[in-house]
Amino acid sequence: MEPASLENLSVLYQSTNYIVVNKHWDIRIDSKMWYEKQTVQSQLKHHFPELADPGTYYGFRFCHQLDFSTSGALCVALNKAAAGQAYRCFKDRRVTKAYLALVRGTVTEENLSLDFAIGKNTTEGKTHMMCTEGTEGCENPKPCQTEVTVLEYGTYDGDQVTKVLLQPLTGRTHQLRVHCSAIGHPIVGDYTYSLRTDNSPYRMMLHAYFLHIPLHNEPIHVTAPDPFVPSLDAKWAPLRCVNILEDLLKNILTKLQAAMQEEAEPEPRTSSPVESEEQRAQCQQWLCEWSLE
């Protein structure tokens, strides 16, 4: 339960093109604020100064985002070409992610498919939040899908909670937090979506457990060790196991292997869909990652 520091950076995978780190909770990926000394970017610069790219504002290109409060697998590209390849995988929704969470209450159904559309909350005092379609002040809601699988029932600090595996099939901001809150089972320690009431846990209990990026020459799949175990947090007391995490991971990997084999089979050549100017601009902005120019 030690807080983040420059020294405690955990590397899950490293090559000449990518580094995947196990992001600590309560740390920003990057920041332009002078007072934000502890960021993943500063950790990377501290441990790998020779890998920083002087042509970018932060020195490193993050392939995706994790919230300040979320821990787990975070992929970093070490050059522009690698960033471009990763971008295509995310853009085409070919990346597979799975998260672990402790949520409030007892999730009675073992498997759930959530499809609440999510938009930006424009209500005064809540503009930093997202919300489900139909909420007053919900702007530009977009379709979102999350698969929920119950792992264990137990208690956290004496309160009923459920440990779940969350698989986002889309990538909307705060998607998992909003979806869990929408079904009446907010994530333990989610200060924002509990409207500042759930403030006793030392962290928000959301962890990016599994990440698979199907890069052509360097497919990446990593797991970030489960932090929600009694040996690491004595306040978490599992009482009944419903699904074994390792078995669910095997099922995910089996599906991935089948999908990869299907992709490897030759198909009739068809013209590639034309990328719009907006998509091309988004790609260039993402690749530049706040260029110094």
From Swiss-Prot:
Belongs to the pseudouridine synthase RluA family. CDD domains: PseudoU_synth_RluA_like. GO terms for biological process: enzyme-directed rRNA pseudouridine synthesis. SUPFAM superfamilies: Pseudouridine synthase (SSF55120). PANTHER family: MITOCHONDRIAL RNA PSEUDOURIDINE SYNTHASE (PTHR21600), RNA PSEUDOURIDYLATE SYNTHASE DOMAIN-CONTAINING PROTEIN 1 (PTHR21600:SF87). It comes from Danio rerio (Zebrafish). It holds the Pfam family PseudoU_synth_2. The active site is at D67. InterPro entries: PsdUridine_synth_cat_dom_sf, PsdUridine_synth_RsuA/RluA, RluA_PseudoU_synthase. This is RNA pseudouridylate synthase domain-containing protein 1. One of its GO terms (molecular function) is pseudouridine synthase activity.
